[in-house]
From Swiss-Prot:
UniProt function note: Binds 16S rRNA, required for the assembly of 30S particles.
InterPro entries the UniProt entry points to: Ribosomal_uS14, Ribosomal_uS14_bac/plastid, Ribosomal_uS14_CS
High-level lineage: Eukaryota, Viridiplantae, Streptophyta, Embryophyta, Tracheophyta
Listed name of the protein: Small ribosomal subunit protein uS14c
GO biological process: translation
Main location: plastid
Source organism of the structure: Barbarea verna (Land cress)
Gene3D superfamilies named among the record's database cross-references: 1.10.287.1480
Domain of life: Eukaryota
Subunit and partners: Part of the 30S ribosomal subunit.
Gene Ontology molecular function terms on file: rRNA binding; structural constituent of ribosome
Gene name of this polypeptide: rps14
């Protein structure tokens, strides 16, 4: 189980990313449309003004049950070892173990 503070920090980053998403997208669109380099630098400075934690690259996917940030399966939202345990316990409908 991940520390509560790390899970809370990740949720805070998600809220910030949602809040500043439209601002970042509009500034990036402006940068791509303007041909002059000096104006691009000015807009790039504005792009750096939102908080650092509002950038989408700072987000991690976390396991739904344990909060583990690594080895997550996007389809299930679970980490690898929790996914394996749930499949073995038949708690995930439609998921089967591989056999060949």
């Amino acid at each position: 189980m991940a520390k509560k503070s790390l899970i809370y920090r990740e949720k805070k980053r998600q809220k910030l990313e949602k809040k500043y998403h439209l601002i970042r997208r509009s500034l990036k669109k402006e940068i791509s449309q303007i041909p002059s380099l000096s104006e691009k630098w000015k807009i790039h400075g504005k792009l750096q003004s939102p908080p650092r934690n509002s950038a989408p690259t700072r987000l991690h996917r976390r396991c739904f049950s344990t909060g583990r940030p690594r080895a997550n399966y996007r389809d299930f939202g679970l980490s690898g070892h929790i996914l394996r345990e749930m499949v073995q316990a038949c708690l995930l409908p439609g998921a089967t173990r591989a056999s060949w």
